[in-house]
Amino acid sequence: PDDNHRLDRYLEDIREVERRIQRIEARNASGEVRELPEAPAGVPDSFAEHVQLMFDIQALAFAADITRVFSFKMGRDGSSRTYPESGTDKPFHPASHHGGTQKGVKDFHLINRYHVAMLPYFLDKLKSIQEGDSNMLDKTMIVYGSPMSDSNLHNHRRCPLILLGKANGQLAGNTHLVAPDGTPMANAMLSMLHSLGVD
């Protein structure tokens, strides 16, 4: 009965993602001028809707053990996309080159905060998936980060990383680490692989 319930839930989750995609496609096919002319056909105008669909598909792939690794880039660094839901209408790339002005820094902060605010949706989704005696979030290691620490200067030193999930007990959580200056980000990636038993 437990396996049947799990399979039913998985299939219903797939059907729900399909229904949401169909609703989005119907809205986008209205002939209206799209907010994002460079967006590929079928991608929702709403950033949050797009990210949630991508997270749902990733969670489904994990639940079905189709993959154990994925990479997802939430946006292009050179994009002029705007995120009005963030509280600013400044495009992403121009906001990243804020010139150190108080307004510019605030706009870029609002956009980044908006992006990070998408993560709890994915975490909750993974936490809702039963995985053995625990849940998918407890069995997962998620790395979220930025390729720059100061995009205004194109500075690649001391780039921020957030680790989420428990990696099957390998991540303790509630820890803030500051690596010594000059430490390559590759060291963090290597430590993560070692914690998963990869040499």
Where are these regions (language model features)?
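Ligand-binding pockets and gating/stacking loops
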Residues: P1-D199
